[in-house]
A protein has these predicted regions:
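PLP-dependent class I/II
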Residues: 2, 7-12, 17-31, 38-54, ...
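A glycine-/small-polar-enriched, mobile loop at the entrance of the PLP active site in fold-type I
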Residues: 35-38, 53-73
Length: 377
């Protein structure tokens, strides 16, 4: 009865985690969920107040457009110029999306034909391989990310692909890209017109210390880049973000979206624009600074605690994920954690190269993370 492509999809990793959490919770257990990257912190007050304000706009109840509100696109262009030094045409190089997952999936529908190859890292956010390649009846060209290669893909493995996905700062590993990698990716994008290069920049603003994440559009115009407010403003449920880059790529995305949705709700788009307006060049608003501080403290504690437990921890100056090797097979560790009412994500859920690793999402208060480490000890 169902489409054949659905039978090729594994159960979505986080749906399985949510099921286990629900079972534990229903049994009255005190579950500490470090499995899913859904921030425990609330959105900044300024964001929710902006949302309330724009809900009363006289046109808030109308359809938007698949490209996004014109005023919001201008605000995105201003933010991008200040934050990254890249000029964008609001009318042709920006599309508002319903969060990164929808944006990435719609990009696939815009470009991937049955049988086309999609170059995707492994381990990686599952949407590249499943939501794009599989749901578009394409094939996956795997680019392994390993500790030995710095969790950076060999771009030779992307030869012949219709689309290529990269993501830095990286989920699940927390890795950041080197200058040499960015230049190599620029060369690939500029010399492979048959391949649509997409940089998923969902964690651009979740960085710590002196590290500042660049945009790939600082290197080339021959790409698109996906941005999300889910993490930086603790707004996963609002489903809002934007895709920017090469005009013909954006036009194809808009055309695909025109058959899928009618744009994000206007009040959410405008709250996003107000949030981005808080940036002063590369300097983030104070709310983002505070969010970074909280996650940075959680990361520093967790990395140290896991090392003391004997795990091989991949240290990182970005994202709210900790990636750690636990052995040749991570499933016994995952089950032991679950026996102690702690949910961690098995690395194999992000691809074959994730076997032997676990990912912890630092989306619990520090005292709960400390309790989890005590239980594991």
């Amino acid at each position: 009865m169902v489409a054949t492509r659905l039978t090729r999809l594994p159960e979505y990793l986080f749906a399985d985690l949510e099921k286990k959490i629900a079972e534990k919770t229903a049994a009255g257990r005190d579950v500490i969920n470090l499995g899913i990257g859904d921030p425990d912190l609330p959105p900044p007050d300024s964001f929710t107040k902006s949302l309330q304000l724009h809900a009363a706009d006289s046109d808030a109840h109308f359809y938007s457009s698949s490209r996004g509100d014109a005023g919001v696109r201008k605000a995105i262009a201003k933010y991008f110029k200040g934050r990254f030094g890249v000029e964008l045409d609001p009318d042709s190089q920006i599309c508002v999306v319903l969060g990164g997952k929808e944006g990435l999936s719609s990009l696939g529908r815009a470009f991937v034909n049955p049988g086309d190859s999609v170059a995707a890292p492994s381990p990686a956010y599952p949407v590249y391989a499943q939501g794009v390649a599989t749901l578009c009846d394409g094939k996956v060209q795997t680019m392994p990310l390993t500790k030995e290669n710095g969790f950076l893909p060999d771009l030779n493995l992307a030869e012949g692909a219709k689309m290529l996905f990269v993501n830095y700062p990286n989920n699940p590993t927390g890795a950041i890209a080197t200058e040499f990698f960015w230049q190599s990716l620029q060369d690939f994008a500029d010399t492979h017109p048959e391949t649509v290069v997409c940089h998923d920049h969902a964690y651009s603003e979740m960085t710590f210390g002196d590290y500042v994440a660049p945009s790939f559009l600082q290197y080339t115009k021959n790409a698109v880049e996906m941005h999300s407010l889910s993490k930086v403003f603790n707004a996963t449920g609002f489903r809002i973000g934007f895709c920017v880059g090469r005009a013909d790529y954006i036009a194809a995305l808009v055309k695909a979206k025109s058959q899928i949705d009618s744009g994000a709700p206007l009040m959410i788009q405008r709250a996003m624009a107000d949030g981005l307006a808080g940036y002063r060049g590369t300097e983030p608003p104070k709310e983002v600074v505070e969010i970074r501080k909280i996650y940075g403290e959680r990361r520093a504690y967790t990395e140290k605690a896991l090392r003391e437990l004997g795990l091989d921890v991949i240290e990182s100056p970005a994202t709210f994920y900790v990636w750690a090797r636990v052995g040749d097979d991570e499933l016994p560790f995952v089950q032991r954690a679950l026996d102690h009412d702690i949910v961690v994500t098995p690395g194999r859920g992000f691809g074959q190269e994730g076997v032997g690793y676990i990912r912890l999402a630092l989306t619990q208060p520090l005292d709960r993370i400390k309790l989890a480490m005590q239980r594991l000890g």
